[in-house]
Design a protein with these regions (language model features):
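Helix-loop-helix "hairpin" substructures at the membrane interface of multi-pass membrane proteins
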Residues: 66, 81, 139-225, 230
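Transmembrane alpha-helical segments in multi-pass inner-membrane proteins
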Residues: 202, 206-277
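Cytosolic-side transmembrane-helix boundaries in multi-pass membrane proteins
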Residues: 10, 175-182, 186-189, 246, ...
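Membrane-interfacial amphipathic/re-entrant helices at transmembrane-helix boundaries
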Residues: 1-28, 64-69, 131, 135-136, ...
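Alpha-helical transmembrane segments within multi-pass membrane transporters and channels
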Residues: 32, 65-105, 110, 151-153, ...
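Transmembrane helix-bundle core of multi-pass membrane transporters
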Residues: 96, 100-103, 107-163, 193, ...
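Single transmembrane alpha-helix segments in multi-pass membrane proteins
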Residues: 12-66, 71, 87-92, 233-245, ...
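Short loop segments and helix-boundary regions at transmembrane helix junctions
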Residues: 37-42, 83-124, 214-218, 230-249
Length: 309
C-alpha cells in the first residue's frame, strides 16, 4: 500500500512538468506523422532535425536574437533538412529510409559546426515562456500555456492547409504517386514540401525545448524517433486515423498520453536507462500485433500499407 501511495503521489507531482514536456515534443510526433501517414514516406530525418532546431535556436539566443527570431531560423533550418532528404530520395533514387539515415548522420556534423562545440548554455536568455502573463516565467504553467498555444495554432493552420489544393495534392501523392502524376500534380514539389514541413516541425520542437531547458546539445535528439513512433501509435489507437482531423489530433493526444505513461513508470521505480528498451518493445508489439491476429484468424489478410521506396 505504501508503494502505491508513493507512486501515485510522485506521479501526480510530475504531471505539470510532464504535460509541458509532452506538448513541446508533440511537434516531433507531428513531424513523424506527416511523411509517414500523409506521404507514405518513412523518414528518419526527425532525429537529426530535432537537435538541428535546438542548435540553431541556441546559437541565435546566445547571439542576442529574440525568441521568435530564433524559432523562425530553426524552422527554416529544419525545413531545409527535410527538403534535402526528399531531394536525395527523388533525385538519386535512394530508399527513403537510407536517405533519412544519410541526412541524420550528416546533420550531426552540421550541428557541431553550428554551435562550435557539443553543448551550449542559454540559461537566462529570453524565451517565449517569459511572455505568458500573470505567470512566473520558468514554471511549468507558463510552459504549458505557451506550448499549448503554439500547438493550437499549428493544429489549426495544418487543418486548414490540408483542405487546400496544395494540401490535397500532398495527400494524393502519398496515396498513389503515379495516379497523382497522371492528374497533373507535381510529385516532386509535393514530396519535397511535405517532408520539408515535417522537418520544420521537428526543428520547432527542438527550438522550444532548448528555450525550456536552457541549453542545446548535439545529442538531444538521441532516441526521439522511437519515442515519437510510440506516441503516434498510442494517439492513433485512441483517436484513429480515418480522417485528416484525426490524423492531426493523434500526435498531440499520443504525446500527452505517452509521456504521462513514462512519468508513471519512473514514479513506480523503473530505472531511466530501461525506458528505451521498454519503448522499443512496445513499438515492436504494436507493429507485430496485426500479424499475430492474422495468424489466429482464418479470414483473408487485410491489405498491407504501401510505402514509397
Amino acid at each position: 500500500m505504501d508503494f502505491v501511495q508513493t507512486t501515485v503521489a510522485s506521479f501526480i507531482s510530475l504531471i505539470p512538468v510532464t504535460l509541458a514536456q509532452s506538448l513541446i515534443l508533440s511537434f516531433v510526433v507531428l513531424g513523424i506523422m506527416i511523411p509517414f501517414r500523409m506521404l507514405s514516406f518513412p523518414d528518419l530525418t526527425s532525429e537529426g532535425a530535432f537537435p538541428l532546431g535546438g542548435c540553431v535556436c541556441g546559437v541565435m539566443l546566445a547571439a542576442g536574437a529574440s525568441p521568435l527570431t530564433a524559432i523562425a531560423c530553426a524552422l527554416l533550418a529544419g525545413f531545409a533538412a527535410g527538403c534535402c532528404t526528399a531531394f536525395i530520395h527523388l533525385r538519386f533514387r535512394i530508399h527513403t529510409l537510407l536517405a533519412g539515415i544519410l541526412m541524420m548522420t550528416m546533420l550531426y556534423s552540421i550541428n557541431l559546426r553550428i554551435m562550435g562545440k557539443s553543448n551550449l548554455s542559454v540559461f537566462g536568455a529570453p524565451t517565449v515562456f517569459d511572455w505568458v502573463p500573470f505567470v512566473q516565467p520558468g514554471f511549468p504553467v507558463s510552459k504549458i500555456i505557451a506550448a499549448g498555444l503554439i500547438a493550437l495554432i499549428v493544429f489549426i493552420l495544418l487543418n486548414m492547409f490540408f483542405k487546400t489544393e496544395q494540401g490535397t495534392a500532398v495527400r494524393a501523392v502519398g496515396a498513389n504517386p503515379d495516379m497523382a502524376e497522371a492528374q497533373g500534380i507535381n510529385v516532386w514539389a509535393a514530396t519535397i514540401g511535405g517532408v520539408g514541413l515535417a522537418g520544420a516541425f521537428s526543428a520547432l520542437s527542438g527550438a522550444v525545448m532548448v528555450q525550456s531547458q536552457g541549453f542545446a546539445d548535439v545529442n538531444m535528439g538521441l532516441g526521439i524517433l522511437i519515442n515519437g513512433l510510440a506516441a503516434l501509435m498510442i494517439g492513433e489507437a485512441i483517436v484513429g486515423k480515418q480522417t485528416v482531423l484525426r490524423q492531426l489530433t493523434a500526435p498531440f493526444v499520443g504525446a500527452i498520453v505517452y509521456y504521462q505513461l513514462v512519468s508513471l513508470c519512473l514514479a513506480a521505480g523503473m530505472p531511466p536507462p530501461d525506458l528505451k528498451l521498454a519503448t522499443g518493445l512496445f513499438v515492436l508489439a504494436m507493429l507485430a500485433l496485426p500479424s499475430l491476429r492474422r495468424g489466429r484468424s482464418r479470414g483473408p489478410a487485410p491489405a498491407r500499407e504501401a510505402f514509397r521506396e
